[in-house]
Each structure stands twice: as C-alpha cells, then as structure tokens.
C-alpha cells in the first residue's frame, strides 16, 4: 500500500500531494493549541532541545503535526511514526514530510508496515536517537527488546499476528544493523509516555528493574488525564460512532466497559447524545462513581441482552468475548476506545463472514445469520473512524509532552531510571497557558489567604496527593 515516493526522501506517506491540504488544517489547529504556541514563543530563542534526536511514536494527526513542529522549533530533530495502523491522517503526514521531517505513517497500513516503520524511526544513520516520545509503549519496547536480544536474552514466542510482525521486524532490524539498538538504548536520556497502556508497561519494566533510562508518565499529569482522557473522549466518541454508522443515538441503550477517565468521558458522550448508558466495572470505587452519576452498573453478561452499542475503555484484554458478541442483539455496534485492540476478541471472529461497508465499518455475520457492526476492527474508534480529540484538548496533552522532553533532556542527571510524573508547578503551568483562550480570569490569593492555607501566592496550589 505505502511506498517511499522518492528514494531521496526520508519518508513514507500515502500521497505527498496532500501536503497543502494538511498545511491549511495545521494552521487552523495552531489557533486552537495555545499551550504549544506559547512554548514556541517562550523557548524558541533558547533552543532547549538543540541536540535532541527524538524518536516519536504517536498518532500522526493534524494535532500531532503541531506537536512535531513545536519540538523542531525548540531545536530537536525528529523521526516520527504513528502508533496505530488506522489513526493516521494522510494529509497531516504529507505536510510533515513536505516540511523535511522524516515521517512514516499511512492510514490503513498493514501490521508488517507498522513495525517496519517503528524500525525506521530508530534508524538515525551514523547517529542514534537520544530521546523517545511514545504513545502506548511500542517504540520503547522495540528498542528495549532489541538491546535485550543483543545481550543474549531469548526473544519471546509470538502468540498473535501483532507479535509475529513485531518479532519479524525486530529480527530484520538486528540483522541489518547489529549492535545499533544496544547503542541507541545506551544513548537515550529518557522517554515521555502519553497513554495509560504505555504507562502500565513502563511501571512493570521499572518494577522488574529493567528500565535503562528515566521515564515521565505524561498520562497522569492532571492536565492530560482529566482533560484529554475525559473531555476529549466526551467529544470524539460519539463523533466517531455517528460518522461510521449514521445511527441515531437518542433512545439507544449503550454499554461502556470501564469507568476510568476514558470511560467517564465515553459514558458522558453517549448520554449527551441521548443514549441510556450502562457501565461495567471491576473496581468498587469506579462502580460507585458510575452509580452516583446515575448510570446503571451491570455485568457484560446482562448488558449484551439489553444494549445496542458497546464501547470498551478498560486497557485490559478479552473484555468483550466472542461469546458475548454471539449473545448480542442483531446489528449491535461494537467498538473500542482503549489504546490496543485486545479489549474485543476480534481474532475469534476471523472465520466468520466480514463485509466492509466502508473503511472502519464492518458487518460480521455469525453462522446463524445474525450480524453485528464492528468499528475500526476493534482498534481506537475515535481515530479509526473519525479524527480523534479536538485540537484544544490535545494542546493540553502535548504541552505536557514538550515540557517532559525538555525536562528529561536538559535535567537528565536529576532523574534516576524510574517512572516520574511532571512536577505540580508544570501541571499548573500547562493549565494556565490555556485559560486566556477561553476568557478565564483567575482570582489572586492575598498574602494572608496564601499563608492561611499554606501555599505560595504563585502556586502550586494543591499538594501532590490532591485528587482533582
């Protein structure tokens, strides 16, 4: 599907002719991303990322293009790939390629191409990456497994199509550039991780004592998880379902699996669209929150009998099984808004009849003739069937990413090989950079008031343990 359009150009995109279209949308997005634009103004002259060679793996969207160009404006060199085979916006990738930035991303790329492109973003010729910006942990795992294998650790036996292509691509890279990933890992100053799933991977690696460089958990910055995960999903989920199916949500019964920040936003999105919403949960605290918000909390076994629309938002695997889908009502809509495609047992449906209605929307027919609708083949529905979160909320997330990259690159000696979150004063800074755009006016504490509650007049205003 994808090919390098000119051997002299260091990119793979669907159509470089889309660059002007992409550039026009990037200009619009910049007006909705005040945090990133403020960082360009603040740090453009000092170039804090000069010398940084960032391997980036994150959805190649218009909003990500603004992030990439902010990193470059602050002095970094960047090589970029998407972190999901369906999430690329081809005009965004074309605009980045036309700007001379190496990018490897095509909407609908195969799993083989996906992992080959991960290899491409680590190939810096005679140099190596010295920073990683990741979403989901795939780039980090590629580098770490490469170094482990070269150190003599056996590579795991793949158990699914994704792992088969990962192992193949990694072996081919190691054969082509022996010792290179070991050298890369040694030079990497740190990784900033965007999403819940990738953060879980990092904490597990750190727990096992195998994290070779510091990591910043961007996901758990308040201005990421409580905004991108919550308010972003609140707008983008229903947008995706409507684009994919043209279904009327009002009056439908929907089930959201998981009531974390993403699940909360998803449930609110469906309720806002007029659906009656049920929630499934394993955690008694989240279940109680859902109940107090007025959602009916049920098991999936009950939900499949009653619901018309199903959304997984857990970060787990096998949340909706083949047996669940067999029990659903005809023409039920099934989709996922968690990072990976493990939440719905898509592979268990492979032997059934699939009919593509349009890209991202498939009818799956069971042996008894019943059909259900699968969106984005179980991958991220808001990016597979629509354009993801709005620019403004992504500005908040990506401002955290840029600050994390600056922090790790310029203050590397202050960090151990552990997983950190950004300090509270930077979290508050990210929020502050987005207030003017919304016409927000902050109240100023008097010295007496600040002393009374034990904070500085300039902040931080909350202790680290405060739950927003």
Swiss-Prot record:
<comment type="function">
    <text>May play a key role in the regulation of the intracellular concentration of adenosylhomocysteine.</text>
</comment>
<feature type="binding site">
    <location>
        <position position="382"/>
    </location>
    <ligand>
        <name>NAD(+)</name>
    </ligand>
</feature>
<dbReference type="GO" id="GO:0005829">
    <property type="term" value="C:cytosol"/>
</dbReference>
<keyword id="KW-0520">NAD</keyword>
<feature type="binding site">
    <location>
        <begin position="258"/>
        <end position="263"/>
    </location>
    <ligand>
        <name>NAD(+)</name>
    </ligand>
</feature>
<keyword id="KW-0554">One-carbon metabolism</keyword>
<feature type="binding site">
    <location>
        <position position="135"/>
    </location>
    <ligand>
        <name>substrate</name>
    </ligand>
</feature>
<feature type="binding site">
    <location>
        <position position="316"/>
    </location>
    <ligand>
        <name>NAD(+)</name>
    </ligand>
</feature>
<dbReference type="InterPro" id="IPR015878">
    <property type="entry name" value="Ado_hCys_hydrolase_NAD-bd"/>
</dbReference>
<dbReference type="GO" id="GO:0006730">
    <property type="term" value="P:one-carbon metabolic process"/>
</dbReference>
<dbReference type="GO" id="GO:0004013">
    <property type="term" value="F:adenosylhomocysteinase activity"/>
</dbReference>
<comment type="similarity">
    <text>Belongs to the adenosylhomocysteinase family.</text>
</comment>
<feature type="binding site">
    <location>
        <position position="281"/>
    </location>
    <ligand>
        <name>NAD(+)</name>
    </ligand>
</feature>
<dbReference type="InterPro" id="IPR000043">
    <property type="entry name" value="Adenosylhomocysteinase-like"/>
</dbReference>
<protein>
    <recommendedName>
        <fullName>Adenosylhomocysteinase</fullName>
        <ecNumber>3.13.2.1</ecNumber>
    </recommendedName>
</protein>
<keyword id="KW-0378">Hydrolase</keyword>
<dbReference type="Pfam" id="PF00670">
    <property type="entry name" value="AdoHcyase_NAD"/>
</dbReference>
<dbReference type="Pfam" id="PF05221">
    <property type="entry name" value="AdoHcyase"/>
</dbReference>
<feature type="binding site">
    <location>
        <position position="229"/>
    </location>
    <ligand>
        <name>NAD(+)</name>
    </ligand>
</feature>
<dbReference type="InterPro" id="IPR036291">
    <property type="entry name" value="NAD(P)-bd_dom_sf"/>
</dbReference>
<dbReference type="GO" id="GO:0033353">
    <property type="term" value="P:S-adenosylmethionine cycle"/>
</dbReference>
<keyword id="KW-0963">Cytoplasm</keyword>
<feature type="binding site">
    <location>
        <begin position="337"/>
        <end position="339"/>
    </location>
    <ligand>
        <name>NAD(+)</name>
    </ligand>
</feature>
<feature type="binding site">
    <location>
        <position position="224"/>
    </location>
    <ligand>
        <name>substrate</name>
    </ligand>
</feature>
<dbReference type="GO" id="GO:0071269">
    <property type="term" value="P:L-homocysteine biosynthetic process"/>
</dbReference>
<dbReference type="InterPro" id="IPR042172">
    <property type="entry name" value="Adenosylhomocyst_ase-like_sf"/>
</dbReference>
<comment type="pathway">
    <text>Amino-acid biosynthesis; L-homocysteine biosynthesis; L-homocysteine from S-adenosyl-L-homocysteine: step 1/1.</text>
</comment>
<dbReference type="InterPro" id="IPR020082">
    <property type="entry name" value="S-Ado-L-homoCys_hydrolase_CS"/>
</dbReference>
<feature type="binding site">
    <location>
        <begin position="195"/>
        <end position="197"/>
    </location>
    <ligand>
        <name>NAD(+)</name>
    </ligand>
</feature>
<feature type="binding site">
    <location>
        <position position="61"/>
    </location>
    <ligand>
        <name>substrate</name>
    </ligand>
</feature>
<feature type="binding site">
    <location>
        <position position="228"/>
    </location>
    <ligand>
        <name>substrate</name>
    </ligand>
</feature>
<feature type="binding site">
    <location>
        <position position="194"/>
    </location>
    <ligand>
        <name>substrate</name>
    </ligand>
</feature>
């Amino acid at each position: 599907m994808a090919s390098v359009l000119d051997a002299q150009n260091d990119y793979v995109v669907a159509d470089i002719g889309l660059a002007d279209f992409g550039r026009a949308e990037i200009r619009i997005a910049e007006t909705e991303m005040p945090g990133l634009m403020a960082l360009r103004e603040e740090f453009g002259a000092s170039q804090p990322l000069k010398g940084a060679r960032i391997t980036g793996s994150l959805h190649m969207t218009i909003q990500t293009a603004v992030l990439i160009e902010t990193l470059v404006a602050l002095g970094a060199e960047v090589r970029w790939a998407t972190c999901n085979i369906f999430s690329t916006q081809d005009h965004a990738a074309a605009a980045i390629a036309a700007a001379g930035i190496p990018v490897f991303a095509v909407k609908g790329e195969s799993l083989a191409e996906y992992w080959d492109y991960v290899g491409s973003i680590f190939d810096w010729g005679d140099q190596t990456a010295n920073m990683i910006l990741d979403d989901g942990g795939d780039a980090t795992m590629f580098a770490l497994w490469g170094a482990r294998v070269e150190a003599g650790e056996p590579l795991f036996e793949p158990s699914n199509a994704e792992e088969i292509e990962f192992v193949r691509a990694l072996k081919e890279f190691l054969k082509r550039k022996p010792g290179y990933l070991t050298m890369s890992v040694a030079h990497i100053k740190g990784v900033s991780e965007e999403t819940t799933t990738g953060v879980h991977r990092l904490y597990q690696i750190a727990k096992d004592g195998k994290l070779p460089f510091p990591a910043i958990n961007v996901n758990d910055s308040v201005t990421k998880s409580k905004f991108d995960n919550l308010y972003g999903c609140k707008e983008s989920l229903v947008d995706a379902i409507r684009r994919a199916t043209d279904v009327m949500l009002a009056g439908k019964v929907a089930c959201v699996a998981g009531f974390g920040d993403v699940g909360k936003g998803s449930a609110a999105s469906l309720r806002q669209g007029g659906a009656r919403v049920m929630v499934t949960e394993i955690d008694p605290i989240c279940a109680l929150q859902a109940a107090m918000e007025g959602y009916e909390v049920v098991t999936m076994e009950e939900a499949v009998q009653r619901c018309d629309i199903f959304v997984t938002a857990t970060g787990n695997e096998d949340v909706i099984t083949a047996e669940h889908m067999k029990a659903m009502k005809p023409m039920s809509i099934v989709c996922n808004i968690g990072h990976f495609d493990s939440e719905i047992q898509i592979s268990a449906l492979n032997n059934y009849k699939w009919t593509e209605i349009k890209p991202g929307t498939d009818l799956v027919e069971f042996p008894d003739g019943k059909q259900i609708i699968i969106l984005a083949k179980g991958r991220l529905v808001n990016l597979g069937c629509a354009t993801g979160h709005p620019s403004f909320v992504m500005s908040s997330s990506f401002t955290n990413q840029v600050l994390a990259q600056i922090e790790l690159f310029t203050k590397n000696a202050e960090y151990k090989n552990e997983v950190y979150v950004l300090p509270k004063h930077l979290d508050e800074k990210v929020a502050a950079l987005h207030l003017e755009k919304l016409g927000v006016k902050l109240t100023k504490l008097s010295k007496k008031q600040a002393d009374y509650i034990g904070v500085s007049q300039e902040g931080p205003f909350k202790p680290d343990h405060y739950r927003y």
